Amino acid sequence: VTVVDDETEFKDLYTTITPNTFYANKLGDDAWVLNLPTKQVYNGKDIKVNPKNQRIYYDMPSDSTLVFIDMADADYQLLQNYSALSSAEQKALKNKVTTNKVRYNLSQDHVITVRSYAGTIKQYTLYCLIYPEFKTVTVNGVKGVLTRDAFNQDHQIYTFTLPAGTDVANAKIEYTLDGTGTFMIDGTEVVSGTTTNLAADKLSIERSSDANAQAKAVSNVEFVFKFQ
């Protein structure tokens, strides 16, 4: 029995930013999506995340698989003819294999090239998206206060202290976002200035990649209302 080492599929793609590890999710056959928060809770404080200087880690079933991130076109041409290269040329190319010492800007996308020991080459796009959040948000003119979830980075809790008797099922929401995105209630877009049911079950802010609309960062929003 001849076993051919032809592994080109990642088990995991991730980055670690103390105190959390952020795992990418597979999208289709040739893409992954990595979402990061703007801030994360660490020792009880909201700490700003710097996505522009982070490492990319991966788990691959075979140690013989070569992995390159943002490979130069000239090197990709060499990789396609790897078997025909001299041992010195092969070694030079292997020296460009990605290691966890290299840091990347995880606010932008990356192309990951994989070559199995058997010679199969596959390319993936790693879409990097920051979870969207409200820059400002008010309900009937009252500002919401954001509390971050230390264990669920996509969960954002906004607390509003409203006058007693306020009907939150028929309230006016005004907001700005911290970038591109769409505020949704039960799957329907709600624009700023709308009077609507803010006691609905599913509130979210969705951000899609400009390069691939299927690549998204979705923030699960919770509104907490206090009355006085």
Label every PLM stretch briefly:
Residues 1-228:
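Beta-rich interaction/scaffold domains
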